[in-house]
């Protein structure tokens, strides 16, 4: 019985490590085609990460359920320490232009940069519904380095 408890404990998602020793980012810049994210402090890149996108990654998000990740200028508008994807930081999609472009359809929302649903899980292909996914270790760093209000530019 004790061995089963140890195995189950080893498989559970460990508590996020909220680091305080990292510099604060003043901006995030993402290039979807390259799957590359850069965290800046002023004009200096202080961290960079690879990421995965939605299941239909090409093009700007137009409506809920299209599997696309938005493109354009947004900002970090919330942080979720209780995310089902380890930790997450919210992106301010949709903005007024996104809502107009969606017309009568819902533009969707709840676009986040987040970790994975299980520890040590690695994805070889795009898998989200439009979010930006990194490893759990990486989202712990990003979560600590960005504040609400940090601007984010997402390029094709």
Q: Each predicted region: which residue ranges?
A:
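Short, surface-exposed loop/turn motifs at beta-strand boundaries within globular domains
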Residues: 21-23, 30-32, 44, 69, ...
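C-terminal motif of bacterial Sec signal peptides marking the signal peptidase cleavage site
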Residues: 8-10
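Post-signal-peptide N-terminal segment of Sec-exported extracytoplasmic proteins
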Residues: 28-55
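Short glycine- and Lys/Arg-enriched binding-loop motifs that mark or flank ligand-binding interfaces
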Residues: 50, 61, 68, 111, ...
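Sec-dependent signal peptide recognition
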Residues: 1-3
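Structural motif
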Residues: 34-36, 73, 110
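N-terminal post-signal-peptidase region of extra-cytosolic proteins
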Residues: 14-26, 53-77, 93-96, 136-137
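Exported/periplasmic cell-wall-interacting domains
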Residues: 17, 23, 78-156
């Amino acid at each position: 019985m004790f061995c089963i408890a140890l195995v189950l404990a080893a498989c559970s998602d460990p508590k996020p490590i909220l680091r305080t020793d990292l510099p604060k980012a003043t901006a995030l810049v993402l290039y979807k085609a390259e799957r590359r994210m850069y965290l800046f402090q002023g004009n200096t890149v202080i961290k960079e990460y690879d990421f995965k996108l939605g299941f239909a990654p090409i093009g700007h998000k137009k409506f809920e359920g299209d599997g696309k990740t938005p493109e354009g200028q947004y900002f970090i508008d919330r942080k979720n320490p209780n995310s089902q994807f380890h930790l997450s930081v919210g992106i301010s999609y949709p903005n007024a232009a996104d809502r107009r472009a969606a017309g009568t359809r819902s533009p969707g929302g709840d676009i986040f940069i987040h970790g994975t649903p299980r520890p040590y899980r690695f994805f070889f292909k795009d898998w989200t519904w439009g979010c930006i996914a990194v490893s759990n270790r990486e989202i712990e760093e990003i979560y600590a380095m960005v504040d609400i209000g940090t601007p984010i530019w997402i390029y094709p």
